[in-house]
Amino acid sequence: MIPRIRLAVATIPAMAFLSCLRSESWDPCVQVVPNISYQCMELNFYKIPDNIPTSVKILDLSFNYLSHLDSNSFSSFPELQVLDLSRCEIQTIDDDAYQGLNYLSTLILTGNPIQSLALGAFSGLPSLQKLVAVETNLASLEDFPIGHLKTLNELNVAHNHIHSFKLPEYFSNLPNLEHLDLSKNKIENIYHEHLQVLHQVPLHNLSLDLSLNPLNFIEPGAFNKIRLNGLTLRSNFNSSDVMKTCIQGLAGSKVNQLVLGEFKNERNLESFDKSVLEELCNLTLEQFRIAHFGEFPDDVSDLFNCLANASVISLLSLNLHGLEALPNDFRWQHLEVVNCKLQQFPALKFNSLKKFVFKDNKHMHTFTEINLPNLQFLDLSGNHLSFKGCCSHNEFGTTKLKHLDLSFNEIITMKSNFMGLEQLEYLDFQHSSLKQANDFSIFLSLRNLHYLDISYTNIHVVFRGIFAGLVSLQTLKMAGNSFQNNLLPDVFTDLTNLILLDLSKCQLEQVSQRAFHSLPRLQVLNMSHNRLLFLDTLPYKPLHSLRILDCSYNLIVASKEQELQHLPRSLAFLNLTKNDFSCACEHQTFLQWVKDQKQLLVGAEQMVCTQPLEMQDLPVLSFRNATCQISEAVISASVLTFLLVSVAGILVYKFYFHLLLFVGCKKYGRGESTYDAFVIYSSQDEDWVRNELVKNLEEGVPPFHLCLHYRDFIPGVAIAANIIQEGFHKSRKVIVVVSQHFIQSRWCIFEYEIAQTWQFLRSHAGIIFIVLQKLEKSLLRQQVELYRLLSRNTYLEWEDSVLGRHIFWRRLKKALLDGKPWSPEGTEDSESNQHDTTAFT
């Protein structure tokens, strides 16, 4: 008998291995937040797990097999707030299935082929706000029993089979409904009667998404006097005429945000007819968004006339030729132009515009001055623009700018210190190349600036007054730049309100003792990815508010003894990982300090020694002061012993099952086999094993006796003992069902390796390989031994055809008969006759 302790140790990895074979996983749900949030995704559950605490609030059961939800299915979880049942093969939901979930706010049923939905299926959900029923075979809103869900805020029934847009009477009982997603259904026509409930009980905050429905007709007046917060119509129309007719049907409505267009991969219209937008004159719009249309007309002077009074305009992924001809009297306050392939920067002149986003338009290279006197927010990021002179109010035609983003552009030459832009609060230059930044105090006028990002702008800081004037700055990011002589000087004198400073990847080798003396409010300092050789703590002494200091990925060897006391008392997190620590006795004080400050150090266990050689790659925490009092010979011997013991332990752990098998072979080696074969397979292939392999071998002629884990393992016995004693020791042969699932399963490959050891120990044993499906060579080569074995030895390939099946079973039975203690001739003839009859009748 195997000792109990060894069996207990063996049981844990064996259970993980068996999860690839069983229809229900042995792995427990992932505890995301203890007692609060659990993820049970894709665990092959056939029922609601009962080992989850009743206090759970977020439960993800997606991708399981919960085909039938009975009443009170979730009564054990009264605190539940979010329940995800996506793609659980649910077909039936009974009355009161969710009864008792008084706090449930989100229910997700995406991808379930629901066939039967009881009238009281959603009863007992007094707090439900979001219901997602995407791809649930829903054919009509009339049949959806949700009229009692008065708290419902969002209803998503996209990707279903809804043909009628008629909103049921019960919508009058949903006063809080704000989002209704009907996209990707089969709605073709919309009539006045379909919206009767909105005429009677207006839902002014409702946003409606009808995208990807094949709309042909909207009855004129259907939306008259209806007020919507949002309406989305994308990839709905197969021609401009149909689109124009449908927009006419929206006449008289008031929509806060109207979205027209197509999706990138769902294009129906080759070109855009500007007459379509003329129909918008009969609508009242606040915001208009148009996306992914084809060619636009060259002349846009009158294109947006019907949108002159809108406040927000968004133009996304359009083939625009220019915007210069837009009238100046439009009342637009927010204009967004993204990825519109413009050839030159638009010289806009809007008095009303307050926010202008012009980004990812990569077909131009030169910035043109604009005149936007009331502009407060300007985003010009990602355009590959070059600025010959920056920055003052003259370029942007405004003195009211508060947000300026020029990131991810080309060369920006600094020729002005933001004269006229004193109200700026946010400034971003990251990944643009700044020129002449050291010539003068370029930020001198920006006394109101709170955020500055000059990361990766190729600045080589020489001028110590570069940050002069930034008295209100709270965040400074300047990663990826450099300093003269790789020394961080005292350049932050005016930044007395700074809270976050990022100096990563600045090639720093030294830090001036007074570099941070004027930063009393600094809380976060990033010094990672530099070239610091020592942890010099003296420069950080004035940082009385510092909480996070990141010095990871440097070349730090140690810290001088007298410096350790200078770290601020407020410091809560110090990251010293990925450095070149010396674990020599000369740094004994620092190494002891590391051990004493484990609570302060982030990832202290990951700090490793790089020298001396005998300590290389060992944890810093493994350093012992006692080693400094013994001879080098003792140290070397100790390290060598430690390595040998570690290697031995690893080898024993790695080949534990092989040793267990070897011991068992001595005990069972001479006994008679109970089974003809032990079957190794992935749980993903269990249907084939049950329906094909077991049926044809155990019910055929001659009958073979297979060892199958779900049937033949002895209850109450450790899984490891079952695998070896019942599986290998009592079987004449082993059948390995090879598939892509098998190769990708670590535990299936592990059991195959055990089978090889078994074959070696029992010379008369045999392994029969069945390739269930064609395998990609790149995937197969990942398992070198298996690839070599299949290349040099014969194996069976499953072919699902009449002739292929006949040959397959004939060859497999012949292989199994080898060594069987009865006459192979008689059985082979019987087998042949039976298969001939089966295959050719």
Curated annotation (Swiss-Prot):
Ranges for the LRR repeats: 55-76, 79-100, 103-124, 127-148, 151-172, 176-197, 205-225, 374-395, 400-422, 423-444, 448-469, 472-495, 497-518, 521-542, 545-568
Post-translational modification summary for this protein: Phosphorylated on tyrosine residues by LYN after binding lipopolysaccharide.
Segments passing through the bilayer: 633-653
Lineage: Eukaryota, Metazoa, Chordata, Craniata, Vertebrata
Glycosylation sites: 35, 205, 238, 282, 309, 526, 575, 625
Membrane topology of this protein: Single-pass type I membrane protein
Name by which UniProt lists this protein: Toll-like receptor 4
PANTHER family: TOLL-LIKE RECEPTOR, TOLL-LIKE RECEPTOR 4
Main location: membrane
Function field: Transmembrane receptor that functions as a pattern recognition receptor recognizing pathogen- and damage-associated molecular patterns (PAMPs and DAMPs) to induce innate immune responses via downstream signaling pathways. At the plasma membrane, cooperates with LY96 to mediate the innate immune response to bacterial lipopolysaccharide (LPS). Also involved in LPS-independent inflammatory responses triggered by free fatty acids, such as palmitate, and Ni(2+). Mechanistically, acts via MYD88, TIRAP and TRAF6, leading to NF-kappa-B activation, cytokine secretion and the inflammatory response.
Any one GO molecular function term: NAD+ nucleosidase activity, cyclic ADP-ribose generating
InterPro entries, sorted: Cys-rich_flank_reg_C, Leu-rich_rpt, Leu-rich_rpt_4, Leu-rich_rpt_typical-subtyp, LRR_dom_sf, TIR_dom, Toll-like_receptor, Toll_tir_struct_dom_sf
Cellular component terms per the entry's GO annotation: early endosome; lipopolysaccharide receptor complex; plasma membrane; ruffle
Source organism of the structure: Sus scrofa (Pig)
Organism domain of life: Eukaryota
